[in-house]
Amino acid sequence: MTAGPGRPATPHTATPHATAPHTAAPRPGGRPRIALVPLDERPACTALPRMVAAVAGADLLLPPAAALPALRRPGDPAALGSWLAATDADAAVVSLETLGHGGLIASRTRPATVASATAAWEPLRALAARGTPVHAVTLVTRTPDSADAMEEPAYWDPHGPDLHRLSAALHRAADGEAGAAAEARDAAGRVPPEVRADFLTRRLRNHAVNLAALELAADGTVRSLVVGADDTAPHGLATAELHWLDRWADWLGLRGRVAVRPGADEACTALVARTLLGLFGGGPVAVRVEAVDPAGLLRTAPYENVPVGTTAARQLEACGATAVAPEGPAPDAVLLVHTPDGAGDWAVAPPAATDPAPAAALAARAARLLDGGHGVAVADCAQPNGADPALVAALAAEGVLERLTSYAGWNTAGNTLGTVAAHTVAAVAARRAGRFDADAHRRLLLHRLLEDWGYMASARGRARAALGSDPARHDRVPADHPVLAAVAADLAACRDRLPGFGGLAVDPRSVVLPWNRTFEVDFALTGGAAAVQATAAVPATAVPATGPAAGARPAEEQE
């Protein structure tokens, strides 16, 4: 029975993790089944974890659409709890914001109390009591530097930028920086008192919910917990709260089970990979993190608050992997990070060109490692909100795209590194268990290349130029707008320029813009293993090392 607000809670009998079995074998002879309550209904939160699960021959189960959120409409926490209780699955991955509030946006916008949000988590205790492994994610509330209120409280237009400045000043003042207290008073004076009060009260409530999530890990209700945040900066209330939560995780002795790191949309995907590793057994996946520019691992990427090397290690930890030293034993895979270069932002300020030298060096390193028998994963963090065309061209020229263990280059460095880590862990765990699905793996690789390089760094710019989108605002595109046909044609052309992946093509009828905006795209790939021999590879030299057409002005800020 599902407990919720106003209903008696299920007695807590979850076994503390220290004495609980680490693995739970999937059903004999069948495909593992993982129940997912996602952050929201976008493909990044639903289709991506499903594709990662498919690499390991696993099925991802989602709640009915009516129970999930739809943009600003909250989902139904009671229905989600009932679905979890009734679903026959080997494990569960749960967004605590969705189960508690009805979705990620709802956690920022709807009125709720700490008591009501945490009461909606009671079904997790029942799952844990019957031995079902539960893995959860909780997110620290963001404070984007934008006047766009599409995903925020209505007062974000026009007060978002001032709230962002207030957030940074409050953090610096708390750290004792000279002049920060005066800056905080000035920033506070620019925001109406009722807006400031609501902003801070919501943060207080959500921080208390984040702390309650740590208690779920401490008492064994959840096997692992990811604490994430998107759109952060070195100074801001989200960064301060992440630091406090990280300290509490340490004080509670939860290091290794609680991962505190930048990133949001990829968090459930990371936990799907960790779940698969637990179901299959075999111990942690060892990954060596490299960069052709080692100093680049010390740079902090845009929209983040820690160096990209730290993000890589923490994302691996979230997936159940371990970052190993270069002088250590041979790893299961080598993660090559294309480090932040400050060249631009594919969503708001796309670079006219990128430096081909580091891209060529990374691709050459990937080829050498592959030829030496190593698994190679590539995380393109050079520019946010899209992939570096020079890197894709260099990887294609080396003939290694289809040989990679994983690849991503989308949105933030945290999103990218979490996706790459998840795909890598799922692939390694599946190979160990004899469950690796080569066709699903190829589909995921190609999907990321086409979305991150083909769309974000190319087709999106042309679509926005045609629409005349305002770069400071989320645009809105009707589902039947002619620009969708142009996007489909662009994606098909990008597919034609990529070597390998024989038999796979973009289905033009499947191309959609989630949330009816150009920030992201979704599409299906047709063909598969049976058609591999029927399609000749396109020459590697066909991939151009260029971005969007001249004059294109991608018009979205980072999520």
Name what the model sees in each region.
Residues 1-12:
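N-terminal acidic, proline/glycine-rich, low-complexity intrinsically disordered segments
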Residues 2-4, 23-536, 547, 551-559:
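An N-terminal assembly and electron-transfer interface module characteristic of large anaerobic redox
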Residues 10-17, 21-26, 535, 539-546:
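Long, intrinsically disordered low-complexity tandem-repeat regions enriched in serine/threonine/proline
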